[in-house]
Amino acid sequence: MNDHVDVVVIGGGSAGLAAAVTAAREGATVRLLERHGFLGGMGTASLVHTFCGLYLLRKEPDAVLANPGFPSEIAGRMIVATGQGPVRMGRVDVLPQHPVEFVRIADELVAGERSLDVRWHTEVTGASCDADGWEIAWSCRGQAGKTRASAVVDASGDAVLADWIGGSTEMTESPKLQRPAYVFGIQSVEAPGDPLTLAGWLVEGVRAGDLPPTALGLTFRASGRPGESFGTLDLTGAEQQEGYDPLDPICLSRLEVEGRKVASAVVDFLRSRANGWQRAFVSHWPARAGVRESRRWVGESQLTGADILSGRRFEDEIALATWPLELRETAKGAKLRFPEGDRPAGIPLGTLRVKGEDRLFVAGRCLSCDHEAQASIRVMGTCFATGQGAGLAAAMRANGGEMGGVIERLRPVF
């Protein structure tokens, strides 16, 4: 099964969804390859239930969207779907989202674009490039095919294309990698309870040996649906800090089992002790644990943590990074570092262009940045913005356009 499109997008998470829809709206024929049976990535498969990075950091009470276009559109759709607007949490504004609604919204967005073809349950199995463009090999349950494309967007989160083309990538050493998240659904919680009271119960459980130490970082949030809550754990990812490898199948398998085991133990423990939890039970598991950091491409330019903290701006910027450095290098919760004066930083187009590959663009958490900057740009609100940039750039490149047009179209207004 072989055919040709203008743009292939690999991965249908926040960045890939934005890239595919944006490229299609630009008039390109697009094929989106997604390994799950639904789109949304971390926001659906991993049940991450908050859009972070959509809004500017500001002391004033009203939330202000940082990036126009696709990020603003999907925020508006989610507000209508859930009936929940942005919420101030400490110094940041976030938008609660529900994974079920995110799947529905993504379905509607791709169905609205005639030139966009989605292939679910499909994994990339090879790639090559010549003067005329790309050939991407893929497989779906044993059925193999190849798709020719003039340009490609890697929004896989793990820079998967590098396995076949030998592109330049980097990954932070294991002890410093952001620890993975494990989010699960809980039903029949009649009264979630005060967070400090619940934290006290968890401390007691760990001290008594009834719960593992990783339970200490667990947080709960009501989903907005009757009796439903989400629990979020930070996991070590390995028995030893240096043993975590988010690209290793054995490590990933261990991670899934660890998440389910800890979540089950916590809910059982609270059901026997905490008021309002007597009828609570785990209602659903994520399709996969939430990997926060893995392999990144080396691009024409690299965004750094220092750039984020100083609010640095660039001549070729196509989006704004507005989330603080959210460092989760242990399973003990986040360490937040905010930029000077809460200033946004620019995200250069060069970070979305792979060094030495004229027709390859990247978006989401695998774009060109260092470990610290990735702790900011990996959140879904920013992924919508970088996906939009990569999708527009790929569509314009496929049709012979110049990259200056991308910068002109997407230059931030703030």
Map each language-model feature to its residues.
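N-terminal Rossmann-fold NAD(P) dinucleotide-binding loop
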Residues: G16
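Conserved N-terminal/central alpha/beta ligand/cofactor-binding core
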Residues: T22, A28-T29, E34-G126, R179
